[in-house]
Structure formats: C-alpha cells, structure tokens
Amino acid sequence: MSSAPPTNELALTPPPPDRPELPDGVEPTPVVPRWKPVGVVLAFALGLAVTLAGTLLIGGIAVALGADAKSLPSGVNVLLTLVQDLAFVGAALFIASTVARPEPWQFGLRGTRIGPFVGWLLVAFFAFNVFGWIYGALVNVPAQKELPDELGADTGAAALVAAAFLVTVVAPLAEEFFFRGYVFGALRSWKGMWVGAVLTGLLFGAIHLGSTPDVLYIPLLAVFGFVLCLLYVKTRSLYPCIVLHSVNNSVAFAGTRDGWDWEIAVLLAGSLGTIALIALLMRRFGGPGPTILATA
C-alpha cells in the first residue's frame, strides 16, 4: 500500500489573518482569563499555609509577651482574622497572576447598571431569607454569639468597632473577592455556571467550619454562597455580592448584641458607606474596567 509523499504545503501555508480592525472609538471585548480548577486547590493551599504561618508568628509573639495560648487577647484574634482574610486574597492574586496579569475587573470589581444591581440584589436577599426561614423552622439552629465576643465586641467601644469593621466590611470584601471573584470564576470556566456555583457554595460553607458555633450553620452558608454566585452571574459585578454579604453579616452581628435598636441602622450605614468608599477608591486608582464582560 503506497501513500503520497509528504509535502511542505502546511509549512508554506500563510498564517491566519489578524482580527479585523474595529471602527475608531470601539474597544475590543475583553476576555476573562480561563483560570484552571487546579488553581483553586493551589489558592486554598497557599491561603491556608500563609494563615498558619501568620498564626504561629503572631500567636507566638503574643504568648512570649505573656498571653495565654489557650485564650488569646481579643486584639490578637482580630489581627489573626485579618491576616487570614488578606492571605486568601493574596493567594488568589498570586495564582491568578500565573495565567495573566490580574486586573480588578477580572475578579468582578466593575460597575453595573443600577437597575440590575438593586433588582437582583433584592431577589437574592429574599430568596436566601425564605430558605433561611424554612430551614430555621425545620432545624433548631442555635444562637450565634461566639465570634463577635472572641473578637472582643463585649470588651469596650473600640473593640466593638474593630470587630464590627472586620465582620461587616473586611470579611465581605475578602470572601467575595476570593470565592466569587476567583474560585467561582475558575470552576465556572471548568464545569459551567451551575456546577461552579454549587461547588463554590460548598467550599464557602466548608471554610466556615472553624468559625461557626454549630455545624447546622454550614448548609445555610453553603446556600448563601450559591445564591451569591447567581447574583454575580446576573449582575456581572462583584459589588452587589459584597453589599448583600455585608448586609447579611451586619444583621447577624447585630443579632448577637443584646438590646440593639437604632445601632443596627448605624452599623448598616457605616459598613455600606465604607464599602462604597473603598469601591470608589478602587475605581479611581484601578480603573473602571470594561463595560461588558465576556462569558467565561
């Protein structure tokens, strides 16, 4: 059986033409980097490793200065929690940088129209609260007071403000950046929106195992993480997710404080105002990002 001799036709074939030029004033549609699922594993591992190293370092210094290793001061706990949040944000940025230079818009830090922002945020808020009401009616979920008190919320005004800032501002920003901005982005490009949202929700619930007073909270947190993924998809912006996360944490934080009334409104206004200021600063120094995101 004979075959035709090989030719160099392929080698002589000219390369495909460049993409056609766009009209003046028209920007090309940016493409979100296709982060890999292995990056999620690496980001988790790196975040946990940095958190552990920071805990050993800061905790060791505190113990060397006379603190009780079994009951660290609230200020140390605040610092350790901050280190953990920053560790996971840094891990996401580092792993993402191995694929492409990280830009804020790639993680969803971009504006969106006010209509979808408010509309879908309200839908997500009511959907999660309906689920929470049904879940609470079926399962006896214990009250949660441990975390704010561990952060020193009951030891004075300054400690209360620090704990509130950490829970209602830092945590929503860091967790949404890591889970919705990076983890969901990677898993969505791997297995699609629904599988990505489910997996991200499960991971979001699992990461809170050490900070919740009862395992019965984990399904609630997993569903909350899932809802936040869908909110991100509908608005194509991380900011509605951050706002909803902050509102949820603010209400939960206020629920741990006995006798709070008008303080709840102050907490909500303060946390959302701070987040809005941070968003404006990011937009100013990081750029507004593209108008339309390509679907990953």
Give short role names for the model-derived ranges.
Residues M1-V38, T291-A296:
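Low-complexity, intrinsically disordered extramembrane tails and loops of integral membrane proteins
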Residues V41-A45, V78-L79, F117-L122, V161-F165, ...:
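Hydrophobic alpha-helical transmembrane segments
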Residues S3, E9, V243-A296:
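C-terminal membrane module of polytopic membrane proteins
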Residues G54-L56, V198, P213-S271:
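Functionally important transmembrane alpha-helices
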Residues M193-L209, S246:
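Small-polar-interrupted transmembrane alpha-helices in polytopic inner-membrane proteins
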Residues A174-L199, L230-S237:
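Membrane-interface helix/loop boundary segments of multi-pass membrane proteins
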Residues I61-V78, R101-A171, S189, G287-A294:
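Juxtamembrane helix-loop-helix connectors linking adjacent transmembrane helices
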Residues F44-V99, L267-A269:
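Alpha-helical transmembrane segments in multi-pass membrane proteins
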